[in-house]
């Protein structure tokens, strides 16, 4: 069998014979045999992790391993209750993490369009419609305008067949397909006698023979490469990994020092171990991973409502770190809808919004552009070449119905457009006779024009007329507009027109069109720059068109900031790393160029977001720190490679997502500050008790109760703090910036010190008579209540008490009330006293607990008033 790569070099007869022998179609029996051999026409699914694998991965964290060791030590020392509580806590966290991960994966599955589009194939000699997945090698498939191509294949017949291959090649202009063999080794975009899976028929009809299905298509090859690409860690994952390792080392060091001190002071080894276990449990924020997961999950829900679906939870925060956004042009920054912007009629430039159907010449332009046009509108879906749909849409806006115009002036013959002639002509019966209407490239048309229409009269065309037309055409083109000329010729009788009739034309006017920017793009780009993010346009379109759009929306200041892909080809990686700093628009780029551009920005220390919709974008989406796929125009391969999907294909949605990402990171920092300062307070109390030869102030169950119940709720509430728009007025944080900055550690130390002081005071008050249970109960209660109140301290770097901010988070109010009720239940319900190692407190002792807890909050709020930290 001839290799797939060579099919475009072979004749139709050779390919037919090679794939199907003497048959012109496949029988049902042959289809079944081939499906057993080649499989179905679908992309292979990656191997999924089982629920057990996901569950076990939750135990990889350093902090979790320390807790497991603590549980084993407790069990060895006979502290079975403490060991059981620690293990239950670890298991609960693992279950929560597993559930959230599986939920995210299930959400992704619901996004995938599992049903391939149907296709018309010849089976047993008859044309039948079947699901795309049932197509096999050797099938003969019929195509018409509006069809998606379900597999790769060799064109057998082409009736003006034009295919949009932008999803695969990035080329925005449709490709005219032929059936003749080609010579030499050609790149994908030049194989004009081949069609490819995922492409779209915009014009004409055709028939092709399937040569590749599933993973053997061009789409499948890219999907296969993606499966071999490793996942990149997001900045938050890297930060939390570093944070966990640093904290683990600090905790282990403190435990070792405390154990050694206890032994050196003559304490029993078992007691020394209990102190060390208490310290480990006090220091480790057990619920941190679950809290981060919950906060990110809430963030994804909020972002989904705004049009951004997050495939990978950690990418939510990753967006907040982005410093460069490499965006596609078509459909993301623009409307993905060709629109008429100007007419040139009767020697005048007329902006589209000023076109008047009451003007005879302008009405004639509107109607002629609709007649010499093959686009249709079926149930609201536009089918046809985008330039032609733009003409019909303008007529519709001006109150001219395409159907009524076509019914009034029926077409009797045509000369279809082809890329060599660059013209299209149609022949119509008019009220006053017969007219051939021609539209096409201006330079080609002017060579065939003998006359020009001015003020309702026809005159011989002059050199001055031609110069004026060429000047306007050049002005339009330099503004990034696509320009077509409209001309016509009257005939006395009906005839079947040919290319020979495309002469002695009357020039009517010019149509200038473009895919205009989205109305919100300019504001989004401005927000992007204000946030310290560099917006870059990367497109397969022409440089002039791309630069015109980029200038309109504020990405480009000067044409010197635009380049074409060929300029990159001759550069080394080092040269490109320097080059990207000054370039804002890349035109006529290939998938390889996109990957190199992304890498160059990353080499300069940037976090890069990359948008894309085509199969050809998939590898660049994977290479980027945050890959953003288009939900409307995006291919499934692009969506699978991305970490975020835009349901509205809108650049402005990315900026909203960046704002959400930054707010989420700030809120996670607040939650971590809250957890660490509370845990630091407990550490200080344990160390102070050891140095003062006092008993261990807390049972492990006390600390686990606080860390998991009364601490988790405020921490989650802090993670769900209202978003603040001022985050977009700051530059992206440095890639290597740690959560544990100097300022952050000072806040944790000061706040933890204040809380630790009041807790130690409570312990000493309770221990006046040597009652260890009373002392432990008071210390536990003050630590618990102080940390509940401390949630309000962590809301902002300034005082919030007696301000509206104190009450602006309903989750915080709920967290405080829930925690207070749980603490009250532990202290007031006798049946719980034994398990939690507490006793009932008298009124005076309760007042001391409430007073000391309140003091901790007031002191920290006072410090915030004096020094913002």
Q: Whereabouts are the PLM-identified features?
A:
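Conserved cytosolic headpiece of P-type ATPases
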Residues: 1-729, 739-740, 753, 780, ...
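Alpha-helix capping/termination and helix-coil
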Residues: 373, 605, 658, 662, ...
């Amino acid at each position: 069998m001839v290799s797939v790569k060579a099919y475009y070099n072979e004749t139709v007869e050779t390919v037919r014979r090679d794939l199907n022998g003497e048959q012109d179609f496949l029988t049902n029996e042959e289809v079944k045999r081939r499906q057993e051999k080649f499989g179905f026409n679908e992309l292979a699914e990656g191997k999924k992790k089982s629920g057990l694998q996901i569950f076990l991965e939750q135990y990889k964290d350093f902090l979790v391993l320390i807790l497991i060791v603590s549980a084993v030590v407790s069990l060895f020392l006979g502290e079975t209750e403490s060991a059981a509580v620690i293990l239950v806590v670890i298991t609960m966290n693992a279950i929560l993490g597993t559930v959230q991960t599986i939920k995210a994966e299930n959400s992704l599955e619901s996004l995938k369009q599992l049903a391939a589009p149907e296709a018309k194939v010849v089976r047993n000699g008859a044309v039948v419609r079947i699901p795309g997945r049932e197509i096999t090698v050797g099938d003969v498939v019929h195509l018409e305008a509006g069809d998606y191509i379900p597999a790769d294949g060799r064109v057998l017949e082409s009736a003006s067949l034009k295919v949009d291959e932008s999803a695969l090649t990035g080329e925005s202009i449709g490709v005219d397909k032929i059936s003749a063999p080609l010579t030499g080794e050609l790149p994908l975009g030049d194989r004009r006698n081949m069609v490819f899976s995922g492409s779209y028929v915009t014009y004409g009809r055709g028939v092709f023979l399937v040569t590749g299905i599933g993973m053997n298509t061009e789409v499948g090859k890219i999907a296969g490469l993606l499966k071999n690409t490793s996942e990149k860690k997001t900045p938050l994952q890297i930060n939390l990994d570093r944070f966990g390792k640093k904290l683990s080392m600090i905790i282990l060091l403190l435990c070792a020092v405390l154990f050694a001190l206890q032994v050196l002071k003559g304490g029993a080894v078992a007691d020394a171990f209990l102190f060390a276990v208490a310290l480990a449990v006090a220091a480790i924020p057990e619920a941190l991973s679950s809290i981060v997961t919950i906060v990110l999950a809430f963030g994804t829900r909020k972002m989904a409502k705004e049009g951004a679906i997050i495939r990978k939870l950690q990418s939510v925060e990753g967006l907040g770190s982005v410093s460069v956004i490499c965006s596609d042009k078509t459909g993301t920054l623009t409307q993905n809808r060709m629109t008429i912007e100007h007419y040139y009629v009767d020697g005048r430039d007329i902006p589209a919004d000023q076109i008047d159907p009451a003007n005879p010449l302008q009405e004639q332009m509107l109607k002629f552009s609709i007649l010499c046009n093959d686009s249709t509108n079926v149930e609201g879906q536009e089918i046809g070449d985008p330039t032609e749909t733009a003409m019909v849409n303008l007529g519709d806006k001006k109150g001219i119905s395409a159907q009524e115009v076509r019914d009034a002036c029926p077409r009797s013959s045509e000369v279809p457009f082809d890329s060599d002639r660059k013209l299209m002509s149609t022949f119509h019966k008019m009220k006053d006779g017969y007219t051939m209407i021609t539209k096409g490239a201006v330079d080609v048309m002017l060579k065939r024009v003998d006359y020009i229409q001015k003020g309702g009269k026809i005159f011989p065309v002059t050199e001055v007329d031609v110069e004026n037309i060429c000047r306007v055409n050049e002005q339009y083109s330099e503004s990034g507009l696509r320009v077509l000329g409209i001309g016509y010729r009257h005939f006395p009788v009906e005839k079947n027109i040919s290319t020979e009739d495309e002469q002695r034309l009357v020039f009517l006017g010019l149509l200038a069109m473009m895919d205009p920017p989205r109305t919100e793009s300019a504001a989004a780009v401005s927000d992007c720059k204000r946030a310290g993010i560099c917006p870059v346009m990367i497109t397969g379109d022409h440089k002039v068109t791309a630069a015109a759009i980029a200038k309109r929306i504020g990405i480009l200041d000067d044409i010197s900031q635009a380049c074409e892909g060929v300029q990159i080809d001759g550069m080394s990686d080092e040269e490109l790393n320097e080059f990207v700093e000054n370039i804002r628009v890349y035109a006529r780029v290939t998938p390889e160029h996109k990957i190199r551009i992304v890498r160059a920005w990353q080499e300069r220390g940037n976090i890069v977001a990359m948008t894309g919709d085509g199969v050809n974008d998939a590898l660049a989406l994977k290479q980027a720190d945050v890959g953003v796929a288009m939900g409307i125009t995006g291919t499934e391969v692009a969506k699978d490679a991305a970490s975020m999907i835009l349901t509205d294909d809108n650049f402005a949605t990315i900026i909203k997502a960046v704002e959400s990402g930054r707010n989420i990171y700030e809120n996670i920092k607040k939650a971590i500050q809250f957890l660490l300062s509370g845990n630091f307070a407990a550490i200080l109390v344990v160390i102070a008790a050891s140095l003062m030869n006092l008993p261990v102030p807390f049972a492990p169950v006390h600390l686990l109760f606080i860390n998991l119940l009364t601490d988790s709720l405020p921490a989650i509430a802090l993670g769900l703090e209202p978003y603040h728009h001022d985050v977009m007025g700051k530059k992206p944080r440095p890639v290597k910036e740690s959560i544990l900055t100097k300022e952050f550690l000072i806040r944790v130390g000061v706040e933890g010190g204040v809380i630790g002081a009041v807790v130690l005071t409570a312990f000493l008050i309770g221990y006046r008579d040597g009652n260890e249970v009373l002392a432990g109960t008071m210390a536990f209660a003050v630590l618990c209540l102080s940390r509940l109140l401390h949630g309000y301290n962590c809301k902002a770097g300034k005082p919030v008490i007696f301000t509206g901010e104190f009450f602006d988070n309903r989750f915080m109010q709920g967290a405080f009330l829930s925690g207070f009720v749980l603490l009250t239940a532990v202290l007031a319900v006798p049946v719980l006293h034994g398990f939690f190692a507490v006793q009932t407190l008298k009124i005076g002792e309760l007042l001391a607990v409430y007073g000391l807890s309140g003091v901790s909050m007031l002191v920290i709020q006072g410090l915030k008033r004096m020094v913002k930290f």
